């Protein structure tokens, strides 16, 4: 009788290790998601610092141009066009980190989605309905 119980426990232990051995079989822990978020924040800071280091002359040129002209020339239409071009250039520069941030957030969300599936959403629905599939937790 004890041998049967021991064999049963050994079998359950073996199944438990097989289910948890695959990366997709394990759910995301809170520490994993917090580490990804902190990594995302550090990357955003690094990107913004790198953009500021690469293009400090752009900010200086705009200030220099405005200071060198007298107040009468500031209202000149040509200067207004130049400022529009500088503003457009600035918006392009500042849009890069936001685009990169959105890509990183998409990556973070896809990792969360991918952690619960093995073959995709449709196959998961089929697997859940039929009892087949890799993450159904059965047998």
UniProtKB/Swiss-Prot annotation:
GO biological process: blood vessel diameter maintenance; cGMP biosynthetic process; cGMP-mediated signaling; negative regulation of systemic arterial blood pressure; neuropeptide signaling pathway; receptor guanylyl cyclase signaling pathway
GO terms under cellular component: cytoplasm; extracellular space
Predominant subcellular localization, coarse grouping: secreted
Subcellular location: Secreted
Keyword Secreted: yes
Presence of the UniProt keyword Chaperone in the record: no
Record-level Gene Ontology MF annotations: hormone activity; hormone receptor binding
Propeptide residues, chain positions: 22-114
Cystine pairs: 118-134
UniProt KW keywords: Cleavage on pair of basic residues, Disulfide bond, Hormone, Secreted, Signal, Vasoactive
Signal peptide positions on this chain: 1-21
Function: Hormone playing a key role in cardiovascular homeostasis through regulation of natriuresis, diuresis, and vasodilation. Has a cGMP-stimulating activity.
Family classification: Belongs to the natriuretic peptide family.
Name of the protein in question: Natriuretic peptides A
Organism of provenance: Takifugu rubripes
